[in-house]
A protein has these predicted regions:
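Short, surface-exposed loop/turn microsegments at beta-strand edges and helix-strand junctions
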Residues: 1-11, 33, 229-237, 249-259, ...
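Sequence-specific dsDNA recognition surfaces
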Residues: 1-3, 194-199, 214-229, 243-275
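A short glycine-rich beta-alpha junction/loop motif
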Residues: 6-15, 46-65, 297-305, 314-317, ...
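Extended boundary segments
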Residues: 17, 23, 209-239
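Non-catalytic DNA-recognition/assembly elements of restriction-modification systems
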Residues: 68, 72, 83-104, 108, ...
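Terminal amphipathic helices with adjacent charged low-complexity linkers/tails
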Residues: 164-168
Length: 404
């Protein structure tokens, strides 16, 4: 305690160390931060529910006491080294920030490319310095997001003028949806307004088409917990919660169960190929989408929407990719009802989400290319983690050598 300007007391749960003649207070403080101190402290802990130490524990500790002049030298040297560490840390943060800004600037040139030739030119510029640009997890994640953005904009693979345009595909899906409504297999919904010019985030390539999310999927809510189910025959089933539905993958580490009426099991059944979309949570959770890719029976909670694709011509993984893109995330952020740190969307807002649909053959090519890029990014991350681990081992070895 330095320069205390007023009379003060200390609480009973604190231990006061008074100044002792021939000891430098700063040296004592250095000792109190050392491994030698903490090792002795842990060995002297009493109690299990709430571990604690007392003055007797401190009294029994071994305290290495050098001559006064050496204490002063130690304090001076430690302070010099700590200042150096702070400077290195600050320099590292500045370098990382500058590096990330450079990466983001160069990646933006890719998404801003006006044509395939310009994209190839900008990519070549990045490729020349690939090993020096993508050396952090943040830069690799930025690369991954840029590739995703290029994919949904139709800039990842060249267009083939011989491909059937997406407009023809959407006509067939509309006919099939109308038949399903007529047969009573899906409910007819109140029509939504068409996509406005303000809602279109970018210009589509030739052969692509904008549609509403509800144009290609039948959206259903899930099981509501806490219902009165007295005198009904129940079965116990597993169900999916918001925590299970991540952005582009499933987290099935903890799958809970719920009782529902036996006659409702088909209503809430999630089948392979269904899309799962989160209703809410924190602002970054809203609209999180993944594909159910398993054969076993499971249902969805009411905070997770189920989207069943109409027909079999649209790849569910394309819709998953687009719904997780920056454009859909921006849509959900603007459409959602937001309170402090929380946000949610309703079924109507999900129905009205604009989606870009490419020709079927092009969608297949995009997904193959996207998977290749994602695998590359994961390999880069593993190599980076391995290199960082090696650096840590080397630093530990050098530190041990210096100490010993």
């Amino acid at each position: 305690v330095d320069d205390l300007q007023y009379i003060a007391v200390f609480a009973s749960y604190l231990i006061r160390l008074k100044y002792i003649k021939f000891t430098n207070a700063n040296y004592t403080k250095i000792f109190l931060g050392s491994q030698l101190y903490w090792l002795q402290l842990y060995n002297g802990v009493t109690g299990t529910g709430q571990p604690n130490v007392n003055g007797n524990t401190l009294k029994k500790m071994f305290f290495p006491l050098p001559p006064s002049s050496e204490q002063n030298k130690i304090c001076s040297r430690v302070q010099t080294l700590l200042n150096l560490c702070e400077q290195l840390e600050q320099h590292s943060l500045i370098s990382l920030d500058a590096h990330q800004q450079l990466v983001e600037t160069l990646l933006t040139t890719l998404t801003d490319s006006q044509n395939a030739d310009e994209l190839a030119e900008n990519w070549a510029r990045i490729s020349e310095h690939f090993d020096t640009l993508f050396t952090t997890e943040a830069s690799i994640d930025a690369l991954k997001q840029t590739i995703l953005q290029l994919a949904v904009m139709g800039k990842l693979v060249p267009q083939d003028p011989n491909d059937e345009p997406a407009s023809e595909l959407l006509k067939r899906i509309a006919q099939e949806k109308a038949q399903l409504v007529k047969d009573g297999k899906i409910k007819k919904q109140k029509p939504l307004p068409p996509i406005s010019d303000e809602e279109i985030p970018f210009e589509l390539p030739e052969g692509w088409k904008w549609c509403l999310f509800e144009d290609v999927v039948d959206i259903q809510s899930g099981i509501t917990k806490g219902r009165n189910l007295v005198n009904r025959k129940l079965i116990t089933i597993p169900y999916l919660r918001v925590a299970n539905v991540q952005r582009g993958y499933l987290d099935l580490s903890e799958v809970k169960e719920i009782d529902i009426p036996e006659e409702e099991q088909d209503k809430y059944h999630v089948i392979k190929g269904d899309l799962l979309i989160t209703e809410g949570g924190d602002w970054d959770t809203v609209g999180r989408t993944t594909v159910w890719c398993h054969e076993w029976y499971i249902a969805n909670q009411n905070h997770v929407f189920k989207g069943r694709i109409i027909g079999k011509e649209i790849d569910p993984y394309w819709l998953e990719t687009y719904m997780n893109s920056p454009y859909s995330r921006d849509y959900f952020a603007s459409a959602s009802k937001q309170t402090t740190n929380l946000a949610s969307i309703n079924k109507t807002q999900l129905r009205g989400c604009p989606v870009a649909i490419p020709p079927s053959s092009e969608a297949n090519k995009i997904m193959l290319k996207l998977n290749d890029f994602n695998e590359l990014c994961e390999k880069l991350k593993l190599q980076l983690q391995s290199a960082q681990q090696t650096q840590l081992h080397l630093a530990d070895a050098l530190t041990d050598a210096a100490i010993n």
